Every structure is written in structure tokens, then in C-alpha cells.
Amino acid sequence: MKISYHGHSVVKIETNGKVIVIDPFLTGNPKTDLKAEDVKVDAILLSHGHGDHVGDTVEIAKRNDAIVVAPFELATFLGWQGVKTHPMHIGGAHEFDFGKVKFTQAFHGSSYIDEENKTITYTGMPAGILFTAEEKTIYHAGDTALFSDMKLIGDRNDIELAFLPIGDNFTMGPEDAALAVKWIDAKTVVPMHYNTFPVIEQDPHRFVEKLTNCTGRVLEVGESITL
């Protein structure tokens, strides 16, 4: 299984001949190396409804006839736009032909903001994502604060690789993320959701250097890990 980081919270997974992308915020993302029109996928996994995570989902999904796996309200909202979806909710798991997906709790918001019409549409609860394929589990925390049930996520799952936000302001910052690392007990941790905008500027190398109970690794944009 090959896992690639493409800036902000964009993660691509290649496994068993399938390509899965998590939170494909590409257009308007100054930290990505991908262009929406070039992305070929079989499935898209979404953690929540904010624009910097849903991103180019509709265009990519329609062009590839890809399924979008998302929290129920967000899946419904995208389905109304002609996207093929599979709705789920926190605590639920489903076995797809590309791997197993389970949604976990995340402490954040989830909405679609229409700046032009000044409206906000509720898109359900935010989620973290546990993805399992080839007998290995990846945890993508989505956008979240630190919460104590991360201990439960770590206790109940043998997590090979975790992507955790460290940007602060909108999510947990480096100090809280370091505690999350201990609770999740992943073998390797990669920071995400930082330096895309001035308000979430952080030093990811400083973060991973302080980790003592796992392998911390900063992935440059476009860099991959093979599990």
C-alpha cells in the first residue's frame, strides 16, 4: 500500500489496484502539487464539509464516476449535486472493494459556506477516518481538537500510520497533537493541516523531533510512504 501526502489534509492511497483520495482540497490550495483535472480515483473519503476539505470533490467524482464516502448529511448534500455517494456516520464501518472504512469522532464543525449568498448549510458531524487495507490501518484524524477518546481509538486499533493536524487555531496545535500521538499509539505519525494559511503556520520538523514513542515523519508535498 502506497500513501502519498499532497498538502494540507490531502492524502492519496493506492492499494489493490485502487486509488482513494481523502479530503481533495486542490483548487485554491497553495500547498498542493495536484490539479483536479489530472486526478484519477476510484473513491473519495471526506472527513467533513468545510471547503478546504471537500475541495474539488464534485468535479473529480463526476469525471471519474468515483464513489464519495462521507458523513450522512454531507453525502446527501453532495448527492443532490449528482455525485455517487455512500453515506456513513460516526462509529459505523463498511467494507468496500478498495478497503474498510470506519468513521471516528472528531471535535470540529462541518458546513458548506456560500459566501455569495451569505448562507451556511449544515453538513453533519465531522469525522476522523480509519482506513484498513492489506491488513494495515491508517488513521486520518480530519480536523479535530484533542479529545480523550483518542485513547479508545488507539486501544481498539493497531494503527500503522496516522495523519494528525497540528496547525492550531482551527484544530489542535503541536502540544495537543503530541499528546494525541501517545494516546493513538500509531507506529508512524505524519503532521498535516499546517502552513496552508498564515493563521496555521507551524514548524512540522520541530513537532516530529519532540515525539518519543513513535516514528514522526514530515512528508513533503508529493512524498510517499509504502506500508
Swiss-Prot record:
InterPro entries: Metallo-B-lactamas (IPR001279), RibonucZ/Hydroxyglut_hydro (IPR036866), UPF0173 (IPR022877), UPF0173_UPF0282_UlaG_hydrolase (IPR050114). It comes from the Bacteria. One of its GO terms (molecular function) is hydrolase activity. Keywords: Hydrolase. Pfam families: Lactamase_B_2. SUPFAM superfamilies: Metallo-hydrolase/oxidoreductase. Belongs to the UPF0173 family. This is UPF0173 metal-dependent hydrolase Bcer98_3294. It comes from Bacillus cytotoxicus (strain DSM 22905 / CIP 110041 / 391-98 / NVH 391-98).
